[in-house]
Amino acid sequence: MAKKQTEGYMSAKESRRISKENRKITNQFEKQRKRKNVPESEYLTTMHDPQNAVEFDNLHTYFFTDTGTVKSVDGVTFDVPIGKTVGVVGESGCGKSVTSLSLMQLIQRPQGQIVEGEIRLNLGNGKAYDIVKTPQEQMQHLRGNYVSMIFQEPMTSLNPVFR
C-alpha cells in the first residue's frame, strides 16, 4: 500500500496549536493598544529630523494566522519630508499598502500587528508621536486631523461633489 503524502500539509492538531499560540500573542498586543487614559509621555517621541513629516524606522508588521505568521512588512525604514511627495514602489504583495495602513493603525486586527519598530509622526507643533505606541483612543483624534490616506480604489473613496 502506498504511503500517504503529507508533505506541504498541516494537521488539524498542528493548526490548532499554532492558532492558540498566535491568539496569545495578538491578545497581548490588543490589550496594550486598547488601554484607556494612557499618559501622553508613553507615546511622545522626537523626530530624528524635524524636517520630516513621518519617519518609518525598522517597521515590522506581521499577520498571525491559523497556519503561521506572515511577515508582511519586515524591517522597512524611510522618511517622508514635510511638503514633499514620496512614492513607495514595489511588486504586488510586497507590503506597500500594509506599510501605509500601519501608519494609520488600520491593519486588520487582531491578526495584523505591528510587532517592532517605530513610526514617528510630526504633529508640527514641536510634538511627535510614536504611532506604534499610540493607543486607539488617541489615534481616532490623529486620523483625518494629522494623517489621512487615499485608498487604492480612489473612485470608491473620493466624491467629486466635495472639493
Where on the chain are the PLM-derived regions?
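ABC transporter nucleotide-binding domains
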Residues: 1-163
